[in-house]
Amino acid sequence: MGKNLNAEKVSAFMASLQAAYVIDKTWTVVASADYLSGDSGDSDKYKAFNVLYGTHHKFYGAMDYFYASDFKNGYAPGLFDKRLGVRFRASDKVDMDLNYHHFSTAAKLPNLKKALGSEVDYQINWSVMKDVKLSAGYSFMRGTETMDVVKGGNHKSWQDWGWVSVNINPRVLFVKW
């Protein structure tokens, strides 16, 4: 499968599964799991999967703790993200998402537990007009001692953020064949 920058043989993988249940036209429940293999340092092969061109924000929690920034102290533990979410479509123009993520390492690390922490993400979207959407969200994360070691920081401090975004996507070229 090639070699990494340290000339180690790479043997890594990613697996993803998502299931959704549409209750009615307004409510949908979603469950998903993403597994990115990690390296525990006990092999002659490097087993940590590299997303390379990531979509971290979309899949691994809105707070971008994973794969938008590197792991610290030489760790490459991979990631196991289990998500449970609900979507409420209030109207044709307004929808809301609430997602819970539980993060753990994919690889067993010496003297550390696998649990990294949990995150809750809330987002509301409003289609103001044809090409304009207003979105807002709020997220918070509770990390563990393992998170402190592999990512840095202090798991006892409250971690949260809120945001507002205006997305303008005009159709600039339309060709009909």
Where on the chain are the PLM-derived regions?
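Hydrophobic, lipid-facing positions within transmembrane beta-strands of outer-membrane proteins
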Residues: 13-17, 80-84, 118-122, 160-168
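C-terminal beta-signal and adjacent terminal beta-strands/loops
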Residues: 130-157, 170-174
